[in-house]
A protein has these predicted regions:
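An ectodomain-focused feature that recognizes extracytoplasmic/extracellular
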Residues: 18-89
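A short, surface-exposed beta-strand/turn
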Residues: 78-84, 137-150
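Bacterial N-terminal signal peptides
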Residues: 2-9
Length: 150
């Protein structure tokens, strides 16, 4: 399981499953390269594939889904910033091991993501923040410039 693999140990910050956002309104997949994915001292960059999913929900939530090997997904999620149109205020990380028998682990977080327009060529998604007071997270991905698939 990805949560075990990451050794996050943040059970105090787990958000109840019923708080997950419904009403997906858009999902894009872009290709490119993970620049960095890490939690605390665990560098997961080498486990990234060359795909990133970008999901938008009816309530304004956005999720950046960093696709990892073995069907694992590392998601950074939050609400669009009111001050900056290309920014998301991160409030959770979702760890999904890709198995239908296991529920994703949702961990409270604080941070932000910035991103560009994937339809205008190369762009970079950059996310950073904290899980609780002690553990930093970083996730960044650069697209190859090809248009996203829907």
């Amino acid at each position: 399981m990805l949560a075990t693999m990451l050794a996050v140990g943040c059970s105090a910050w787990v958000i109840r499953a019923e708080e997950t956002p419904p009403n997906l309104v858009g999902l894009l997949t872009v290709r490119g390269q993970c620049l960095k994915v890490s939690i605390a001292r665990d560098d997961l960059t080498g486990r990234c594939t060359g795909e990133l999913g970008m999901a938008v929900y009816a309530d304004g939530r956005t999720g950046f889904h960093f696709m990892m090997r073995s069907r694992h997904i590392f998601t950074v999620s939050g609400i669009h910033s009111k001050q900056q149109s290309n920014a998301v205020q991160v409030d959770r990380i979702v760890l999904n091991d890709g198995l239908e028998t296991n529920k994703p682990e949702v961990i409270a977080a604080e941070g932000s993501c910035t991103y560009g327009d994937p339809y205008r060529g190369r762009m970079t998604v950059r996310c950073a923040g904290k899980l609780g007071r002690l553990q930093d997270f970083v996730a960044s991905f650069e697209t190859d410039g090809t248009p996203p698939t829907e």
